[in-house]
Structure formats: structure tokens, C-alpha cells
Amino acid sequence: MPLGPEERRFVRLIWLLYSTNPYPPSGEGTARQRRRARRRWRQQQDQIRVLVERLQEQVYAVDRLADEAQHLAIQQLPDPPHSA
């Protein structure tokens, strides 16, 4: 299924968030600083997961609409009368 502009924006955002949010290094800073870094990282990962779920919901909604549209049929209409 081709992605629309909104879905492409979500995919780019998710990719950017994942690529710019590495797990915090261990061994740097005090224990409190490391805990805070891990907490911030988890919060950012939760935001990414919310975006991914939102994107998946939209994709499923579009798929359902496409399935429903396949069941629709155009009513057969008679040909228009020809002028003589």
C-alpha cells in the first residue's frame, strides 16, 4: 500500500527519533545522572511507540476502507438514447 504524505511524515519522524536517540552510555556521570538519562530515553521511546501505534491505526483504517470499497458495485445503467 502506498503511503500518503501524512504517513510519510510519520515514518520520517520515527526514523529521525530512533536514529537520534541512542541508549545512554553506561559509566558516564553519577548514578543519578545515569538514572535520569535512562528515564529521559524511556520517555522518548514511549513517544516513538505512540507515534508508531498511531501510524498503524491509520494504515489499518485505510486498509479497511479499501476492503469496503471493493464490495461496492456501480449500478448498471442503460445506454442513453441516441438522437436521430
From Swiss-Prot:
One of its GO terms (biological process) is mRNA transport. GO terms for cellular component: host cell cytoplasm; host cell nucleolus. The keyword Membrane does not apply. It is found in: Host nucleus, Host nucleolus; Host cytoplasm. Disulfide bonds: none annotated. Its main location: host cell. Residues 13-21 are annotated as: Homomultimerization. A motif (Nuclear export signal) lies at residues 65-77. Keywords: Host cytoplasm, Host nucleus, mRNA transport, RNA-binding, Transport. A motif (Nuclear localization signal and RNA-binding (RRE)) lies at residues 30-46. GO terms for molecular function: DNA-binding transcription factor activity; RNA binding. The RNA-binding motif binds to the RRE, a stem-and-loop structure present in incompletely spliced viral pre-mRNAs. This region also contains the NLS which mediates nuclear localization. These overlapping functions prevent Rev bound to RRE from undesirable return to the nucleus. When Rev binds the RRE, the NLS becomes masked while the NES remains accessible. Escorts unspliced or incompletely spliced viral pre-mRNAs (late transcripts) out of the nucleus of infected cells. These pre-mRNAs carry a recognition sequence called Rev responsive element (RRE) located in the env gene, that is not present in fully spliced viral mRNAs (early transcripts). This function is essential since most viral proteins are translated from unspliced or partially spliced pre-mRNAs which cannot exit the nucleus by the pathway used by fully processed cellular mRNAs. Homomultimer; when bound to the RRE. Multimeric assembly is essential for activity. This is Protein Rev. The gene is rev.
